Structure formats: structure tokens, C-alpha cells
């Protein structure tokens, strides 16, 4: 069996107004090579962008990989490592029996994560972590670029 490639992924989401124009930023490192990705949406939320960033990064991988995925979003990290198990058992309902917010993205993240061996890590935002700061710059620039793309899953109450 061949050993899986080790990819370091850093992600961040940004939203101006929350809801408002938003964007995500991604930095991917593999064997000294760096790839950056970002995109923006006309109307979305910070949490949706924090979820979309790792989705896009994981979906960009062309084969199963060992991934160290670092984000400053406790919402995303706690959701994918802890809360999601209960949500799935309860038919995507919370412990309060209300529908899980951003369920379209949670399902997509869950599916993308199944293909890889992921170590989900958290880093404090705006604390000088170089890759996280770069992701923040990419996400903010995407949000500030007057994006017109529609976030199809965004609902005003999410």
C-alpha cells in the first residue's frame, strides 16, 4: 500500500456585515509548493464561508490524502469533529430539535472529508500565524471585490 501524500491546508472565511458580501481564502502546501484559492459571494454569512473554504480545498484534491487542516473557526472544527455525529443520528436536527443551520454545507463537508485522513486543527485568528493571516487576506479581498456570485444555499435565517 502506498503512503498517502501529506497536504497542509489552511482556510478562512470572511463576511462584510454578516450577512453581506463574503469570501473564503485557502492556502495549500505540499512538498514546498503553495497553492492559493479564494472566491467571493454577493450575500452570505461568515459561518458559510468558514465551511465553504475547507470544502473547496478538500474537493480540489485529486486523490485520497493525509491532510492537516488548520482553521481559526471553532464552529467549523467543532462541527465536523464533534457535533456532526449527533446531527446525523438525529436526521440533521440539533439537540433542541431544530434543523441544523447550513446543512447543505455540512453535508458537503462531511462527504469531502470521508475521502481523506484529516487532522482538524484550530489556530487563534489574527495572532500572527502566517498562513492564517494570508487566508484572512484572501478571504477579505474576495469579499471586498464586489462579488456577484450567488450563494445558492444561503437563507436569511441561517
Swiss-Prot record:
Task: Give EC number(s), comma-separated.
Answer: 3.1.26.4
Database matches in Pfam families: RNase_H
* InterPro entries, A to Z: RNase_H, RNaseH-like_sf, RNaseH_domain, RNaseH_sf, RNaseHI
* Gene Ontology CC terms, in alphabetical order: cytoplasm
Indicate the segments forming the RNase H type-1 domain, all copies: 3-144
High-level lineage: Bacteria, Pseudomonadati, Pseudomonadota, Gammaproteobacteria, Alteromonadales
Species, as recorded: Shewanella sp. (strain MR-7)
Protein name per its UniProtKB record: Ribonuclease H
Residues binding Mg(2+) 2 = 12, 136
- In the UniProt record, the gene name given for this protein reads rnhA
Principal location class: cytoplasm
